[in-house]
Each structure stands twice: as C-alpha cells, then as structure tokens.
Amino acid sequence: MLNKLQRYLSDVNINSNFVHGNNRLLEFSTNSLNFLAEYNPDSDPTYFRIMLPRIQSEDLQLDKEALDRIMVINSTYKVGKIIRIGKSLWMSAEFFINPTENNMLVFPRAISLLTDMYNDYFSPSHE
C-alpha cells in the first residue's frame, strides 16, 4: 500500500521517504505540512492510516475552547480525528481498503481531508 502511495506521490511530484528504512512508515511533505503514512500488512492488510504528526506540542493548552474545537472537527470529519499523543496533538485519517484493488483515489482524498482539518483547526475564526 505504501508503495502505491509512493508512486502516487511521485506522479504528482512529491518526494517521499520510508522512515528509518522501515517499510511500514512513509513520510512526505506537501502544502507546507509534514505527513506520515502507516501500513502494516502483517497486522491488518486492509488498514491504512495517514497522519499529520505533532501539529501542536509542548505549550499545548487544552482548555475548554480547544477541546470544543477538537470535538467539532472530529464530528465534522468522520474518518479524520484529532488525538493527543503525549504532549502533542496529531491528526489522523484511517481507512479500511482492499489492498488488491486500485486505491489511488484514497491518497489525494486523505491528503485533502487532513489539510482541510488542519486549516479548520488553525483558522483565525477559532482563535
């Protein structure tokens, strides 16, 4: 699955690299955002996840307003979620797909979904 994603990214002139030689994590940047894609066929060959890691960290203050904003975004984008990992917020979109089918449309949709979520989260109307 990540090889298919890498081919798609190459076709649209986006560089990508496997993280630390690990063939289960692929990193790439587009629209000034750093993405991380995960696929582990040994664990579940139908599960594919793409993330925006550490969108907000260290000085993370999850007050009521921030939590409300997260809840609105999580309910608006059904397959996308904002989660807290340690002292950071991550955005994640998860899909169950058949790895033997042509899944090329999933990739631009996932990237667009996370980009939209990111823009909504950091929109001036929410600050």
Where are these regions (language model features)?
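Short, internal acidic amphipathic alpha-helical interface segments
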Residues: 49-88, 92
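Hydrophobic residues embedded in beta-strands of well-ordered beta-sheets
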Residues: 23-26, 46-48, 89
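Charge-rich, low-complexity N-terminal segments
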Residues: 1-36, 75-79, 84
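Well-ordered alpha/beta subsegment
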Residues: 79, 84-109, 122-123
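Long, continuous compositionally biased terminal/linker segments
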Residues: 30-58
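Extended Gly/Ser/Thr-rich low-complexity repeat segments
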Residues: 40-45, 104-113
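Short, well-ordered, aromatic-rich surface patches in folded extracellular/luminal domains
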Residues: 113-119
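Flexible helix-coil linker/hinge segments at domain or subdomain boundaries
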Residues: 119-127
